[in-house]
Amino acid sequence: HLNAGFPSSEEGLAAWDRWVRTIAEHYKGVVIDWCIWNEPNGKTSGNTIEQATDFAVRTAEILRGIIPDARIAAFALTEADPKWIEPFVKELEKRGKAYLFNTIAYHHYKHNPDTGYEEVEESRRIVARHTPNIRLMQGEGGTQSEWCRNGALSNVFWTELTQAKYDLRRSLGDLGHGDDTEVFHLCDLEYRAVKRHYGLLRYGLLKTAGQADGFRVLKVKTAYYAIQNAVSVFNDALECLSPERTGSTLQGVENCVVYDWKDRETDTPVVVFWDASAMPSNDNITRQATVSVAGNPIQNPVWVDLLTGNVYKIEESHIERSEGRTVYTVPVYDSPAFITSQDILTLDQSWFVREGKNMKRYH
């Protein structure tokens, strides 16, 4: 339903209600996450906020009636647009219908994935003021692994490396700002009936063939392993700290971002950071920087590169203590890495290590 209008006739709405009821009953006990309508605020949709509110409420009432514990997202907006979100949540507040929804989903396509959070923050404040039970969720973000002529962020010479960096930065940036996040897409897509998106689009974590070749999986992309590395650490075992509870800083590289997490069981710090100054580059040039973390030194500290999954010991010569803080000298580049204790990580040694090869420490 990309940029499509809602059914509006009595007959059309009745058919929609039957379809929602049927699909909810079919997937009850299997599917818990539901999102109502893709990009209803698209420029060519012709939808008004009033229509969208009515439509979302009637759909959510059917879903909630059949699947009481469903997690329902109101829309998947083209962006976190405060001009769309504010009247929607005000109307939910007025009608007493906020309980129907868990989240409002938005899409976030920026060439530099670390830009554009201003409107997200503004929208979050609006939602918290009027419907505090609802959260924002980044519901579609990512980029392609090669040059493609169509789709969001198209006509750019992306590579598997820049895609992997982008997906990591998008995901950890969203989580760091307090929003749940999704990666678009598991596998490559082929559009044949949509003029604007015609052909193969390479957003997938898996590279697939087109319809003519049976949609075969051709390879596992770099981004697949990068996201696998990220979710193996940044999951419910960790807590992302709000800005007022964080204190880590980074010096030596301009325009870096730093997000503080902690292990829920041990309170061990997990500090993730990267160079956010530009869109991802097609090289891995690192620069040394210092990361200052509040409190005593981390036991058995390591620097972890999420792009590769490699874990490196931080030598004592790279650690300083000063006025209740610990400063670590580590590499920084335009892909996320983090500092934590090796004690909270479960390591899967590569064949290189298992075979007894010597690996050089980073410099």
Where on the chain are the PLM-derived regions?
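Solvent-exposed beta-hairpin/edge-strand motifs
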Residues: 291-311
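C-terminal beta-strand-rich structural cap/linker in extracellular carbohydrate-active enzymes
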Residues: 313-362
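Carbohydrate-binding surface patches
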Residues: 247-297, 338-340
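Flexible loop residues that form catalytic
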Residues: 39, 80, 109, 141, ...
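Active-site cleft segment of glycoside hydrolase catalytic domains centered on the general acid/base Glu
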Residues: 2-129, 147-169, 195-201, 286, ...
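Aromatic/acidic polysaccharide-binding cleft in carbohydrate-active enzymes
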Residues: 146-253
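Structural recognition of the beta-strand scaffold that forms the well-ordered cores
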Residues: 32-36, 71-74, 102-106, 135-140, ...
